[in-house]
Amino acid sequence: MPIAQQKDNYSPSCQFASIPNDEIFIHVLAPYLETSDNNINYYYDFSQSISEYTKTFQDLNIQWKWQPVTMLTFHEVIDNITEEKNKTGKLPIILNLCDGDEINGTPGISVVKKLHEKELIYTGSDEHFYRITTSKIPMKKAFDEAGVSTAKWESIPSKDHKINGIFNDLGSPIILKPSVSGGSMGVGIKNVVENKQALEEQVKLMFEGYRGWDLSIDGIVAEQYISGREFTTMITGSAQFPELCKVYKPVERVFHASLPDNEKFLSFDRLWEIYEDETPMPDNDNFYEYQEVESVLSTAIQELSLAAYKSVGGTGYTRVDIRMDEKTGRLFILEVNAQCGLSEDEDYTSIGAILRVNNTSFTQMITEVIEDALIRKATQWD
């Protein structure tokens, strides 16, 4: 199916629609982290999500349960789901929101492996997609191997790594990112560097971590900084069934006009409104706004996004971030995000803006995500 032919009137196939509502029970697994750090607590505040899922499953008239899990409890929680299935006879469907790297105490890949081991139906990333996108390094390698346009990059595996010639290879400026990180953690305006001294100083700071949070796992990625417009889109479905993937029309993230070009990106301080090292926008304006993308460019972004998704063997759903070089007009994939945050609230995640532009409700999108999980499981059974 051509990407331009969006499933604007998407309805679930017989997989989900054919199962009576009273025979289904949805278990929403959410990562929980015990910490006294308010900044990190803010990042893991799911009160908005609970409200949205409450409404969604009321709309669908399906029983559900919100189940926080930690690295210490996920085995028991999943085992209990299996036991409950045997007692009630209801079909458990796991809406898995766990997105942690497990280095810093938040559950992630182990939950996926456990769900697979128990042969449960679960949404989102499988083990391969989770692993290849947890670190930017294997993800970038996959882009390069598939010929997917991405910014030039190099790995800095340790604080003692020799970085001579890196500006000759990547150009200037360079942006430094933790290889393993989510929600822009470890990324700030000082990460954009234009000379060797600034680069060495920032690398040293990054290897020291953030508030006890280790950001050095798998090192640091030094990347050509693409100055220009930024876009983001969403895909539901799995790369093994590209004809069933829904590639949403993208939105442009338009940063505040007062910002210089080398600050027009999602820094942790400004994204989460912490303002420890960076300043808010003048007159309390928004850091950025979302707007629709012109049709021809939108199609090009959708095509590139699907190619990137396929290159990493994407499953379930994803958010794809893209930049366009202001001088050449060339599009570059920044990253493909497995287990991205799901919300219709634009203040929480760009998914909300994407849903708005595509005239899609949160309930409809969640239905697509669940439908994909059922299709994948049905394929395994066949």
Predicted regions and their residues:
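ATP-binding N-terminal substructure of ATP-dependent carboxylate-amine bond-forming enzymes
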Residues: M1-I121, H128, T134, P138, ...
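Active-site nucleotide/adenylate-binding loops and adjacent lid/helix of ATP-dependent enzymes
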Residues: P2, Q15, E23-L29, E84-T88, ...
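ATP-dependent carboxylate activation and anion-phosphoryl transfer catalytic cores
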Residues: P2-P12, P242, N286, Q291-D382
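Anion (oxyanion) recognition and catalysis
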Residues: Q58, H116, D144, N168, ...
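Hydrophobic beta-strand scaffold residues
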Residues: W64, I121-Y122, T150, I174
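Phosphate-binding site of ATP-dependent enzymes
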Residues: K196-M281, V296, A300-E303, L331-F332
